Amino acid sequence: MIKLYIISGMSGAGKSQALKIFEDFGFVCVDNIPIQIVADFIDICLKDSIRYKNVAISVDSRAGKSLTSFKDLLIVFKKKNIGYKIIFFNATDSVLLRRYSETRRRHPLGKSVSEGIKLERKIMDRIFTVADEIIDTSDLTIGELKKVISMLADICQSGKQYLNTSILSFGYKYGLPNDADIVYDVRFITNPNYVHGLKFKTGRDEAVRKYIERQKEFSVFFNIFSKLIETTLPGYIKESKSHLTIAIGCTGGQHRSVFTAEKLAGFLKSKKYKVKLNHRDILRHDN
């Protein structure tokens, strides 16, 4: 069986942000899906319940007159024994007006913002009255909203598993990585490139690993470096960051940065973090 969440509510109350949060939690998400095709879409999901195990769809006032058939859709779900939960996102009129003013966006119903809000409340009442959960986002931060959704959706994902940590080794001679959140330079380590027999090896090779680990400054550095990263990651999780890229660079991106990245990845995995490792320049061999 699939886990289905129907996201609805007032425009400007956080539906789009909520759908992004569901997506970060691994849900298959569809925004503003027409009511007429929801049943067919769910049938597709049921045929591949492994791939579509967790599904979140957004239905709102943009559906127009088709919203009149929303309750009929719920009857279809019940007949097919499809479990679902409707989450309605709401906010006070004053907060909605302020958010529209800040973003300078038009109301989707094409009226003035105040008129649009008033009309939308009438239209969305048919969903509001059948909602399983109503979330007032007037005073919620993004982090708080994420916690509320994780509880409502019964997502037992630890913060460590929520944060996707990418560790990237690179060579400065080929340029800085564009997507790095943190960049650390390990060119202070004696370069194995100039040691006989190590030039065409990489930081993955045992001989290179032993050469670097014998350097006292590396041991001191890595103890401090790993503790620094371990100390800061919970803060990123607290601030609701779902992706973090740590880039480690040396001259050519083959020896020192590769070994350090490998060692950091192993350290974080031992601490139960979800880690992806990539060596950008490991295959480049300039003479």
Swiss-Prot record:
Coiled coil: none annotated. It comes from the Bacteria. InterPro entries: P-loop_NTPase, RapZ-like, RapZ-like_N, RapZ_C. GTP binds at residues 60-63. GO terms for molecular function: ATP binding; GTP binding. Keywords: ATP-binding, GTP-binding, Nucleotide-binding. Pfam families: PapZ_C, RapZ-like_N. Disulfide bonds: none annotated. ATP binds at residues 9-16. Displays ATPase and GTPase activities. NCBIfam families: PRK05416.1 (NF003828). Belongs to the RapZ-like family. This is Nucleotide-binding protein TGRD_433.
